[in-house]
Amino acid sequence: MTPKRALISLTSYHGPFYKDGAKTGVFVVEILRSFDTFEKHGFEVDFVSETGGFGWDEHYLPKSFIGGEDKMNFETKNSAFNKALARIKTANEVNASDYKVFFASAGHGALFDYPKAKNLQDIASKIYANGGVIAAICHGPLLFDGLIDIKTTRPLIEGKAITGFPLEGEIALGVDDILRSRKLTTVERVANKNGAKYLAPIHPWDDYSITDGKLVTGVNANSSYSTTIRAINALYS
């Protein structure tokens, strides 16, 4: 029997972002929880980024942000999570036909590279065209900017409902002015630009995720589990 396989994308950007000079990059909690959930449901999981590189968002490292099983999986060198991470691929090394689910993780680093990550977008569109699922969490839906449905040649999210990290959350984190000064976009703007309907959570830190056919989106790291479960369920619906 062919194993079920999921591909989790990471942002390649790792550079200064915050007012204190700290770097942004991958939000580790999102990939820890999505990886663990896929594995517990029988999936083989690989990681990919546009360039094959990545770095952690320094404001959300495990020592101050997570504990329990997440912390153990991150800190144990030979954990399944770290073994998979050590095998991270560049986007042009990936064969889309090997995977049934594409899961776009985020962190503020995604603001910089996802909208122009053409190779990641190509993988996602091919998985979707083959009957697979595209899922994205937090800032992950920025990958949808310019992502084309191969069958219709229209924006893949056109006419669909999506969610993602809201502007209200950026304001609460004190980074909305950084987005403006660096001309970085938001999930809601990407939705509007590509003909999708953006559904906001009641509060930016709520566990909130939605499914629209084979397209699944979640708001934040607190939504990692529910978004992953929705992606798995969407695959078999």
UniProtKB/Swiss-Prot annotation:
The active site is at C138, H139, E170. InterPro entries: Class_I_gatase-like (IPR029062), Prot/Nucl_acid_deglycase (IPR050325). GO terms for cellular component: cytoplasm; P-body. It comes from the Eukaryota. It catalyses: methylglyoxal + H2O = (R)-lactate + H(+). It is found in: Cytoplasm, P-body. This is Probable glutathione-independent glyoxalase HSP33.
